[in-house]
Structures are given as C-alpha cells and as structure tokens.
Amino acid sequence: MGSDHHHRKLHVMFFPFMAYGHMIPTLDMAKLFSSRGAKSTILTTSLNSKILQKPIDTFKNLNPGLEIDIQIFNFPCVELGLPEGCENVDFFTSNNNDDKNEMIVKFFFSTRFFKDQLEKLLGTTRPDCLIADMFFPWATEAAGKFNVPRLVFHGTGYFSLCAGYCIGVHKPQKRVASSSEPFVIPELPGNIVITEEQIIDGDGESDMGKFMTEVRESEVKSSGVVLNSFYELEHDYADFYKSCVQKRAWHIGPLSVYNRGFEEKAERGKKANIDEAECLKWLDSKKPNSVIYVSFGSVAFFKNEQLFEIAAGLEASGTSFIWVVRKTKDDREEWLPEGFEERVKGKGMIIRGWAPQVLILDHQATGGFVTHCGWNSLLEGVAAGLPMVTWPVGAEQFYNEKLVTQVLRTGVSVGASKHMKVMMGDFISREKVDKAVREVLAGEAAEERRRRAKKLAAMAKAAVEEGGSSFNDLNSFMEEFSS
C-alpha cells in the first residue's frame, strides 16, 4: 500500500487571484510542478481561462504526457454588484473610471463567492495540497474542512514580506516628525531606510485594512508559503522570514526562467500589441546594452502630464528606447510632445498595450529597465542581468525598490517619494527621467551595477538547475506533500 502511494502522482491545485501579475507566475508554477511529475489543476473563471488556455496548449504540445488542466469556477459579476465581464483586475485598469478604487475593493470581497465551489471541489477531488493566492484568505478554512494543506502564494519576495512584518510590529512611522522623514526599519537586516509616505497604509480600520488583517491571520493558520524567489537573491531575508515570520516557506523561482523557448516567452500574459519578430529585429539593429526598456506593468496608471514628461526625458537622454504605454491608437495623443514619434523614429519604439517583456529584457541590445518594481517585472529584470531605474507606484513596490537600490545595488531611483493607493504614479519631472536613464546606462558606477546584475542573473539560472537552491526547495516541497 505504502509503495503504491509513492507511485501516485502528486496532485497540486493552484488558485490565482484574477490579475495578470498573479496569474502569470501561477501558470509558470503549475507548468513547473507538472514538468516535475505532478498533476497540476488551475482554478479560475471562464474569461480568465481563455488567457491561460493557449500557453497551456503550447506547453502540452511541447511536453506530451504531462498533466496540467483548468477547472472553471462560476463568477456572476452582475449578481455580485460588478460590471458585466469584470473577471480580472485588468477590467478596472483598462477603464479609468472615477469609482475605480471602490470597485476594486468590491472585486476583492466578491471573490469570497468562490468558497462554496472550492469546498465542493476539494470534497470530491481531494488534492494533495492547494496553493491559493494570498488574497483568498477564506481558502485556509475551506481546505481545512477536508484536511487539504493550504499554502499561500504571495506573488512577492522575502524582502518585502519581512519589511512589512517589521513595520507592522514596531510601527517606526509613529516616531517620526513628518511623513517624509526617513527612518531605518527596525530589526530588518541591512539598515534599510524608508519614509512613512512610501509604506503600505496600515489603516486597520478601513475595509481594505481589515481584509489585510484577515490575509495575515489566514497565513498563520496555513501550511506554509510558496515564493517566486531564489535564496541567493535575498538570503538574509529568507533566513529572517523563516525564523521570525513563517517557519514553513519554500522558494522555487525565478519562475520566468523556466520558459525556455521563444513561443513560451511570447505567450506569457496577453497577446502582444506588436509582432514579436518585428520587435526583435528592431533590437537586433542596436548595439549591445544601448536600449532602455520602459514599462510600468499591467496595473500602474499615469496621467497624460506624466507621460508627456517621460517622453521628453527619454528624448533628452538621446538613448534608444522601447516604451510600453497602456494606451490605444484611438486615444487622442495629447500625452506626446508634438512631432515626438517622427523625431525619435528609428531610435525609439512605443508599444501601446502589451509587450513581449521577457523577450525584450533577454535581448543583448537591452541595457537597462525602467520599472515600477512589481515583483514579476523585477525578477524578470534580475534574470536578464539588467540594471534598473526604479519607479515604484503602490502595493509593496517601494519595499522592492529598497531591495534593488540598497541591498543588491543594481538600480538607480528615479525619485518617486509617495506610495499611491490608487496605483497612480507620483509626478516625476523630465529632468529626473533623463538623469536616471543616463546614470543607469553609462559611467563607472553603471559598469559596477551591470557587473553585479550579471552575477545575479547567473545565480538565478543556477538556482533552478539540478542541485540549485530553488530546484532543491521544490524537491523538498514535493516530498513533504506526497508523503
């Protein structure tokens, strides 16, 4: 009986929050587990399943015999007080309505509707474990009813979790004279300096504050945490996290590195708004390390005045660039200086919508990355060996910036100083954009940063190879939940 059990495939269920920044790494994770012999099931809604199906089909064609599938849950948006077709945070970030923030909070709470469906599925399927997004705190209780271990997937790294923990425990922001006065985060290794304006609002009385308390409590009761990170990137913080915050944690990243082929890299997320081959051909015509790639992820939003400053700053820097803007051609182009595209023709490329990010970052012509410091983007930049210009907007991005600029020392801050609840960026002048872009690409300090970044990229690749830290952590996770 015992030996039969070991021949049975480990069955892992994955339940990502419905946002690209959560679904893409979860898809990578499900592919990784099935490539190591597990059966992976991703739980999502009908509209979101369409985003995942094509990359899953590609993966299955490349790896016949591996098991990965999708289980669809019902999400009646209108009944839940949400607009029709609103099954992904992208719905709000693509349509900048006045009540966007209110609706996003409603969206978070509406996901509780999945609880009964999840319990029904767990009762009939009994997987070996459930890796559910941090934003589904009720999943711990649902899984517990059927003795299914629930793991939390955070979608961020050790550093930001430790920083948030230390600030939550010690509340150093209460002891400074003003919200812009810098302070050192107590207990956190590395003497990390931050301001109150840059930390996540800890208002425990707001709806979102209460929700985040629930998130933390459900993590304490869970069977542990799975992280998209690797030990060498943030070893001090991995050790701190496991000794002070959550004893059971496994790092299995960087997940983007497992996508080896052109097709797999091109199919992460939405269909790109540019032909991938055309984009790579443009990069092929540029010198190594000469192009700056500018992208602020799928959620951050900038007003036209800010986009205008970015355009002017890029033009002033004289650097070749690829700039991803969440705009369509139909938008009146008031956010661009007059004649801008004509003047930068051949030197700059604007992609409106979605870009094949990993393909661009991995290209030898790309020499730097202007990023909002979302964890997925940051890790993709690390894996590509790129120095970064950090421009955090909201969520845990200011913590991630500190990791890049103060710990890894592979980045230059553009000077964003305020955490924005609505993910609308702090205003930065063209002069600051120009200065940061030049600083990250040229000069002696830039070469030092590039050397450090290349070293980290080599460590990232080694971590996922046989015998690497993430390879071994995945092994120990699979052994733990198979027994």
Swiss-Prot record:
User: Which cysteine pairs make disulfide bonds?
Assistant: none
Identify which residues the record assigns to the active site. H22, D133
Tell me its EC number(s), please: 2.4.1.-, 2.4.1.237
Q: Which UniProt keywords apply?
A: Flavonoid biosynthesis, Glycosyltransferase, Transferase
Keyword Transport listed? The answer is: no
Which signals induce this protein?
Not induced by salicylic acid.
Q: What does this protein do?
A: Catalyzes the glycosylation of flavonoids from UDP-glucose. Uses a wide range of flavonoid substrates including flavonols (quercetin, kaempferol, isorhamnetin, 3-OH 7,2',4'-MeO-flavone), flavones (luteolin, apigenin), flavanones (naringenin, hesperetin), flavanonols (taxifolin), isoflavones (genistein, daidzein), flavonol glycosides (quercitrin, isoquercitrin, rutin), and chalcones (isoliquiritigenin).
Q: What is this protein called?
A: UDP-glucosyl transferase 73B2
Q: Which gene does this sequence derive from? A: UGT73B2
